[in-house]
Amino acid sequence: MVRITADFQRERVLHPAAMAQLNQSFAKGWADPNKLNANSRELAISLQRVRENFASALKVRPDEIEFLGESDIGFQLGISGLLKSGSKLFYSSIDRQRVFAVASDEENRGRKVTCLPVDQSGVISSYTAAESDVVVWQVANGETGNLQPNSPATGLIFADCTASGVDLLPKFDYQTALFDSTSWQGPAGVGILVIKAADKWRNPLPHNDLTRVPSSYSIPLVMASSTALSAYLSEADIRAKLKKYIIEFISSQILEVDIASEINGLAKFVSFSVGKVEADRLLLELEAAGFAVDSGSACKSADMQPSHVLTAMKKPIIGNIRLTLHKDISEQMVIDFCQALKSCVAKLRKN
């Protein structure tokens, strides 16, 4: 088995601090926080502290936060929950596949939806929306890391923060937002839905009680996510420097490479396409050299292969490699990776 010396894949192991919290929770067990016994009251207090920790990190009020047992369902809750009869839905051609799914479902129900195009930098085109229309606006793209230089103009805004997490909070007003626990190295299966405009939102799922979202989340996972978040925020972050080095190295040392990522985008994502090289072969060569990377679309939908994001940006999809810069990636790892990349590309082009 090849020894991986630097892992640039998007998937990441659970943060050690969160793992310790999770083991403690499973060993201790947990009660129903809605009951009145001592253990339940203690857990309810702990959950409130967790909620306050999330609120502080996300710059929102504790009562605006809802925990989800699956982050993907947050797209339907956050988007469809804002739609009213007659509302139009706007989203972009570089949004996540879950957004496309919600838009398709709404269109099938007779709603007017508009998919906004983007330019070669991934900047969403201008639009005209009424105050009651809903606009999906991603803070940063999950493949390229590119940001939107402009704030959404009008409408009710759903902020997709699943890629950006706490690395970059929205700098615009929004009504609902969705965060994914894995973006701060927390456990999968935890989403954070922020509902700022409670008077303009309603639960779009079938329900017969007053709860805003399904209470199907795992309490130990939510608590572990909070622990991971605190640890993540306390760690040093040199990823902007590392991203700059990678982009400048590729630009100057390897010919015929199209870099989709802007240097001033979200620091943790780099996407580039190497001409005259098959991505899968390059991925395996890099793996043999000790470097794990991703290739193709970050979406999991078979309908969006190999990359609807690059296609929308009119970027080449052949030879595409994606890097995720995690906080434990060192400067030396990046230097070694760049040299290995140059060598692997030269080898494949020669053959």
Task: Locate the predicted segments by residue.
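Pyridoxal 5′-phosphate
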Residues: 1-351
